[in-house]
Amino acid sequence: MRALVLAHFERAAAQRHGGMNMSDLIKLTPIFHEKIWGGRQLETVFGYDIPEGPIGECWAISAHPNGDCQIAEGPYAGHTLSWLWAEHRELFGNCEGKEFPLLIKILDAKDDLSIQIHPNDEYAAEHENGSLGKTECWYVLDCEPGATIIVGQRAKDRAEAAQMIEEGRWDDMLNVLPIHKGDFFQIDSGTVHAIKTGTLILETQQSSDVTYRLYDYDRPGTDGKLRPLHIEQSLDCIDFDVQAPTDGTVTAPEVDGVTELESNPCYTVDRVRVNGSKTLDQRWPFMCLSVIDGEGTVCGAPVHKGSHLLAPSTVTSIDLEGKMELIVSHL
């Protein structure tokens, strides 16, 4: 996918220009989703104006049909990101791809999420109406003392996994890890996983909303009925060769304030720390920027914790000032 999307971008790169200001960056209006496991931290921690109820997800940068963000200001205000991708591909270096490929979320897990898995691109295309698969990664923004997550499972093959699921041997099957603020986890498609109680996470993922549940704690959904499970699809999708992590400590070096957290065929994700001023080179079809702590300016305009911006390919450098921390992603 990444190679496909980048194919035309490289040929168009010479046409880009620099010297951009804030008006050239794309500010989007986030979309909020109620979840039975959600809380209120998107309001109390980030200051978002969220609906009543248990709000579990902020879709901050998204062109997915289940949450297509509107452009908040500028010449394209009122249009959606999917519209911009379809009608003004020149802003993305004329790169290929049917849909905008990434989705940036913040998740507030007041309660446990279901034990779940996501398909790869091939399985999703065949079984989910041509959808992308879902590879994702998590940066732990905050968590309660003693918080844990699930990443990976111990069954050696489909038959053993099916038996463990049927017998409810979740403690034997699942790889449970303690987490701390600042931890990072890469979750490849085919990996059994779950975010658990008391966790606030920034998620970078493929633009997909396909989730298969193995177990949901026998709890009712918002309609009072048990949410459906997807055992056969989950068994189809488990990658039994995945090596479960032992912890999420970031060990990559920080170079001039930038730490590369992950780079794979779907995305590259960096943590950027600013204490004063810094300039980021923008050499990609687009760049997603999420301020996760502090405040400052981006290209001269004020930003703060919870601000999200999309830099198109026409923006070749991004000036950052202040004291803040960002998660930055690109293809």
Question: Where does each model-flagged region fall?
Answer:
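Transition-metal
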Residues: 5-12, 16-156, 216-244, 269
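Short acidic-glycine-tyrosine-enriched beta hairpin
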Residues: 175-185, 300-315
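Glycine- and acidic-residue-biased ligand/ion/polar-headgroup-sensing regions
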Residues: 109-111, 135-157, 161, 274-299
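Ligand-binding loop in jelly-roll beta-barrel domains
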Residues: 99, 107-112, 122, 143-146, ...
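An exposed, glycine/acidic-rich loop-and-rim segment of catalytic or binding clefts
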Residues: 166, 170-173, 184-186, 192-243
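Functionally critical, mid-to-C-terminal surface segments that flank or help form catalytic/ligand
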Residues: 226-284
